[in-house]
Amino acid sequence: MQRYHNLDFLRAFAMMMGLVMHAPLLFWQPDFAKVFGIDNIAPAEEWVNVIGRFISSWRMPVFFLLSGFFAILVIERKGTSQFLRDRVIRVGLTCLVFSSLYDISDGSFDYTILHLWFLYELMIFVLFFSLLYRLKIIKDLLCIKMPPKIGLIVVLWLILTVPLAYILNNSWHPSALKVPTTYFDLKIGNLVYHFSYFLVGVILYANQNIFIKIKKTKAILVLGILSISAFFLRLYSDHLTIGQVENLSEVAQTQFDPMLVFFNSVMIGVNSSFWCLFFIGLASKFIQSNSAIIRWLVEL
């Protein structure tokens, strides 16, 4: 069976970045530290916040994109029924068991999912996509070979899904994309945003010639410049939007200029889509063979 070593590496890399992002969590959210009896914890320094924003800006989009790619790979090789069975065990049961353990750790059961929200959303995508893919018109549409112009439209769509998510969540607020905390806390905007990346992963499977195009040195340099520029624009838009708030704990209660929030949402979309393309190109260029470390990380 063919392995996509570039995407295996990217998946493992995104997993490791999750550890980097969550390690200083107590310093980002001092109120969370109080749950463990830690009071007056020193807030994180700004450079730590910047690293956190950088990782969080592309990690989950990459995760859902790769999930879509590997979903269609399994369906094409083993069929929809086997795909569903595999994902129910690997994703559904994992989410249910470990979210339940998290939930009862405080002595009460209130359907909390905490950091496993992405497994919950992924399971929803798996069920919905399995039904969607049975329709021939949808299957043909997702498997079509894309000309470059359509590819640009797809990237534009990914960018616009962020402000669209704000609209669907009925909130022009920087925290509009806040992830769910319970099974009943789903937001339609978040689902549309993340499912869009899932579908792009599906489309990418039928257009693997894109790997060849974006792994060229010139393409990587251009994507790298665009990605870095997009991130600095993202930081600037963050400053314009929430820079007025002295204490981040007050963000939820603060009113913001809708135009600034819209600009910030577009910058989030630009940043996420460019970094996804850049990392896929980078991994495709330099990761062309398997290794024991990558295989171990992927099988975790």
Per-region residue spans from a language model:
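Alpha-helical transmembrane segments and their immediate juxtamembrane cytosolic regions
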Residues: 1-300
